[in-house]
Design a protein with these regions (language model features):
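N-terminal export/assembly segments and adjacent metallocofactor-ligating motifs
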Residues: 1-324, 328-473, 482, 486-493, ...
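Active-site-adjacent helical/loop segments in soluble small-molecule enzymes
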Residues: 515
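Short coil/turn segments at secondary-structure boundaries
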Residues: 180-190, 218-220, 321-329, 496-500, ...
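A glycine-rich, hydrophobic/aromatic-adjacent loop/helix-cap motif
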Residues: 492, 505, 511, 523, ...
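Active-site lining segments that contact anionic ligands and/or coordinate catalytic metals
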Residues: 57-59, 275, 539-542, 687
């Protein structure tokens, strides 16, 4: 009798009883359970991760049966964290737990596809020609070439074999190298944060043939340009365990609970530990439920809120009641003490120029190494300019007995060896108080910001300055700290245009930002006070989690830097549980030395060709033709409009020509033919 028939025989199941007949023992058929055992049976367990479009790098146990992935579970053998700190596990998410479904999805491309028109042309050409000749006959025939290029975007892809696909690719590459040069071949390889080996396979191939490697981190706006602008380094941020050490966390423009699922538990655990969590985001996103306070500015107005927070912190924690920890941090570890030249204008006012450098004090090569790259501070001890260690000039080109070991922040004059104490402000010992002009880009009403109009495109602020002699001329200089405070409109008793109270509608006050962001002025004041107070009491253990919500928006560099200003004023960067925490993508990998040797073919050649993808696609896909914001809107009202009268693409190309942006190709000829041309030219000169 079958199992199905047996299950229908209700009265024959009883085989006994117990508890004086109150309970009975039945005979049930359990063969159906085998189907479940077969479903979860496996031959082996493989450790892996889910590297496609995810940089979480979570460790998973992948169960394999007959070569097929049948299911997966999270691994739990991560190294333990310090005592009292939650462990990293469980790491994983529902997307990872169902990843085997992606592998065998009907929508996944599992074989090469080619346009039907190109396949027909190729097969016809290969009947009589070798591979490279066949490709040349197609691309050099206008009608044949148009037959498949005109079909782009219209579908019509058909299946081909791997052998045919590889032959076409190799033939096209060899043809291009022979006729135009290897630097005319460019390629993009998936980011190493997904799979180091997969990325390296593509870049190694391009490096070996002399092609141009397209960048990844900057192209899709995962790279925060504010980081190299501020520190000269690319996204050096803490890992998620550090959140637990924080006393105050602002989640600003990143949806941690959704986009960083493996790390999100640290945020919740930190909150249980007493950390206050504030979410700054226009929409009620997932992370809002994990926060204590939701602040929702209008989209694209984050910088205004951040500047108002900076205004409050500078006024209360740096001017009215200077916090000792903040003062020492800013003096030793930021650019606040660095001197800036004040450039006179025709109207008798000044603008901030460049930083004062060692070369301005008379230091020259070879006695002084890199004098144009060493910044200058004002020394409180000697009451004179000093060349503080730690600037870029001390990092590059160190020489034995000269700059060796001086790339640090010890309070020493790098050129004289004397102890120094960089001075933050000239407020109490200035030689003069000068009027400084700053550009104000909110001086005109714009769509979406109807209440942002002020009286002028130029702000005039009073700044304390010192008169020093640079290159034989008397020049006014000011510290970055004094310039920043005046720019924020903080009233420091110098008179002029500044905010007497937070209610004044002057740029960067809480009242000013309220008209732009929609966030109540009192909220901005409270946020500033709470964050700074937490940072003060914990010596910098307060942080801001940032991400794509802000970074992938127009003017991201300015928005990010307005937030970074808050972090630096509160002495948080470099402190466990403090600083800026940018989480978009993943540009770092652990075995970088060996990986780069493999990926960029350094075992064959010392350097590869690189091209920044942002410029590449902006120019070659004609995106520059669709700019809707004229360059004049981006230009400072203090700038010379006659000098800057082009378009965005003009200045992008100019940056490439000057070497500010990596670019390839760099020559207008085939580089493989340069040597032969040079020999021919030399031979002709010798014969003549």
């Amino acid at each position: 009798m079958s199992g199905i028939m047996k299950s229908s025989l209700f009265f024959t199941k009883k085989v006994g009883s117990y508890s004086d007949g109150w309970g009975e023992v039945t005979g049930e058929d359990r063969t159906w359970e085998q189907s479940y055992r077969d479903r979860w049976a496996h031959d082996k367990i493989v450790r892996s991760t889910h590297g496609v479009n995810c940089t979480g790098s979570c460790s998973w146990q992948v169960y394999v049966k007959d070569g097929i992935v049948v299911w997966e579970t999270q691994e739990t053998d991560y190294p333990p964290t310090p005592a009292g700190v939650p462990n990293h596990e469980p790491r994983g998410c529902p997307r990872g737990a169902s990843y085997s479904w992606y592998l065998y999805s009907a929508s996944r491309v599992k074989h090469p596809l080619i346009r039907a028109e190109l396949k027909a042309a190729w097969e016809d050409a290969r009947k009589t020609m070798k591979p490279i000749e066949a490709w040349a006959s197609i691309v050099e025939n206008p009608q044949l070439r148009k037959s498949y290029t005109a079909a782009r975007g219209l579908g019509g892809m058909v299946r081909t074999t791997w052998d045919e696909a590889l032959e076409i690719i190799a033939s096209a590459n060899l043809y291009t190298i022979k006729k135009y040069g290897p630097d005319r071949i460019s390629g993009f390889s998936p980011i190493p944060g997904y799979s180091m080996v997969s990325y390296g396979a593509g870049t190694r191939y391009l490096s070996l043939i002399g092609g141009a490697l397209l960048s990844f981190y900057d192209w899709y706006c995962d790279l925060p340009p504010s980081s190299p602008q501020t520190w000269g380094e690319q996204t050096d941020v803490p890992e998620s365990e550090a959140w637990y050490y924080s006393s105050y966390i602002i989640v600003w423009g990143t949806n941690i609970s959704m986009t960083r699922s493996p790390d999100a538990h640290f945020l919740t655990e930190a909150r249980y530990n007493g950390t206050k969590v504030v979410n700054v985001c226009p929409d009620y996103c997932e992370v809002t439920k994990d926060a204590d306070w939701w602040i929702h500015p209008k989209q694209a107005t984050d910088a205004a809120l951040a500047m108002a927070v900076s205004h409050v912190i500078f006024k209360e924690f740096h001017y009215e009641h200077p916090d000792p920890y903040f003062t020492e941090y800013c003096r030793k570890l930021t650019d606040f003490p660095i001197l800036v030249t004040m450039e006179p204008r025709a109207d008798g006012r000044y603008t901030a120029g460049r930083t004062v450098r060692a070369c301005d004090l008379g230091y020259k090569e070879p006695e002084c190494n890199n004098p144009e790259w060493k910044t200058v501070v004002w020394d409180e001890l000697s009451k004179a300019p000093a060349v503080a260690q730690g600037s870029m000039g001390y990092r590059w080109g160190q020489k034995e007995g000269q700059d060796l070991g001086k790339w640090n922040l010890h309070e020493v004059d790098g050129e004289t060896g004397k102890a120094i104490k960089p001075q933050l402000t000239f407020l109490n010992d200035s030689d003069a108080v000068i009027d400084v002009e700053y550009p104000y880009f909110g001086g005109r009403e714009r769509d979406g910001f109807p209440n942002n109009a002020m009286a002028s495109d130029v702000m005039v602020r009073r700044v304390p300055a010192k008169r020093v002699q640079l290159n034989g001329q008397d020049v006014y200089v000011a510290t970055v700290f004094d310039l920043f405070g005046s720019y924020l409109g903080v009233d420091r008793g110098l008179g002029g245009e500044c905010a007497k109270s937070y209610a004044d509608n002057i740029p960067f006050t809480p009242a000013w930002q309220e008209k732009i962001t929609g966030v109540e002025a009192q909220y901005a004041i409270t946020l500033a006070r709470e964050f700074a107070t937490a940072a003060s009491k914990t010596q910098g253990r307060a942080c801001v989690l940032m991400g794509a919500g802000v970074n992938q928006w127009f003017q991201t560099d300015n928005t990010y830097r307005s937030i970074i200003n808050i972090l630096l004023m509160c002495g948080t960067c470099g402190v466990p549980g403090g600083g800026w925490c940018h989480y978009v993508g993943q540009e770092k990998i652990r075995p970088e030395a060996g990986w780069s040797e493999y990926s960029f073919a350094k075992d064959w050649e010392p350097a590869s060709r690189h091209m920044n993808s942002t410029s590449y696609f902006y120019e070659h896909t004609d995106q520059w033709r669709y700019e809707r914001i004229p360059l004049s809107d981006m230009l400072s009202p203090l700038a010379n409009t006659k000098v800057f009268d082009g378009t965005y693409v003009d200045y992008n190309i100019q940056s490439e020509l000057m070497g500010w942006l990596p670019s390839a190709p760099q020559l207008n000829v085939n580089p493989t033919k340069i040597a032969a041309a040079a020999k021919a030219a030399a031979s002709s000169r010798n014969n003549s």
